Amino acid sequence: MSLLHQARFFITVNHLRDLPATAVPEVAFAGRSNAGKSTAINILCNQKRLAFSSRTPGRTQHINYFSVAPVKAPDPLAFLVDLPGYGYAEVSGSAKYHWQGLLSDYVQTRQQLSGLILMMDARRPFTDLDCQMVEWFLPTGRPIHVLLTKADKLTNSDNAKALRETRKMLQGYAEQMETPVPMTAQLFSSLKRRGIEEAQGVIAGWLNLPEAQKAEARSAAEKSEPPAADPAE
């Protein structure tokens, strides 16, 4: 079982000064207000009501922290960080200004941040605001993994096209950097439970969770095994 299944609500933050003063790694989740971010977090953590989605898109304007640790552990091993959904027009100007500042400052300056999970609707990837998020985070040199959500809404051929075009866009961004930045993408569907294990593996690796260490050890052991002898020899 993934340790992500043990995630628990930790704190809600409305100002950078209130961020947890911890040194453990964090993975942030970002995306448009209607990209299915809260639903995806709940699915990845195998919980129904860990991350709440507002009935009115764009109303969740805080940063929510979820701790990841075994049930009886005294301290978190890591944090999942649910960032405010962006891009919804009904938010007032002053709230939007504060919200955008909170988002940009967090992703650009948070030293504990190990990587960004960027959620995009597979039908409408790379909106202007999605591109803005990539451009804010890219200079940090940390990895970005795109979840193309709501893949169940598309045909197989349209999904393949969306994934191909997304990877091409990410490659274009990566080529702008002097030092290579890991940028990957996958298809994801909360409804069809598609892509869950792949996404969990990425997150566990970034957070250096025990399950990722075990998977790495198994992979190393398999690579070190001598090839099977040819029966003909």
Swiss-Prot record:
GO function terms (MF aspect): GTP binding; metal ion binding
Domain (EngB-type G): residue spans on this chain: 23-209
Coiled coil: none
Residues engaged in binding Mg(2+): S38, T60
Superkingdom of origin organism: Bacteria
Gene3D superfamilies: P-loop containing nucleotide triphosphate hydrolases
Pfam families: MMR_HSR1
One GO process term, biological-process aspect: division septum assembly
The keyword Cell inner membrane is annotated on this UniProt entry: no
Cofactor: Mg(2+)
Keyword Magnesium attributed: yes
Residues that, per the record, bind GTP: 31-38, 58-62, 82-85, 149-152, 187-190
NCBIfam families per UniProt: GTPase_YsxC
The protein's name: Probable GTP-binding protein EngB
Protein's organism: Cupriavidus necator (strain ATCC 17699 / DSM 428 / KCTC 22496 / NCIMB 10442 / H16 / Stanier 337) (Ralstonia eutropha)
Lineage, uppermost ranks: Bacteria, Pseudomonadati, Pseudomonadota, Betaproteobacteria, Burkholderiales
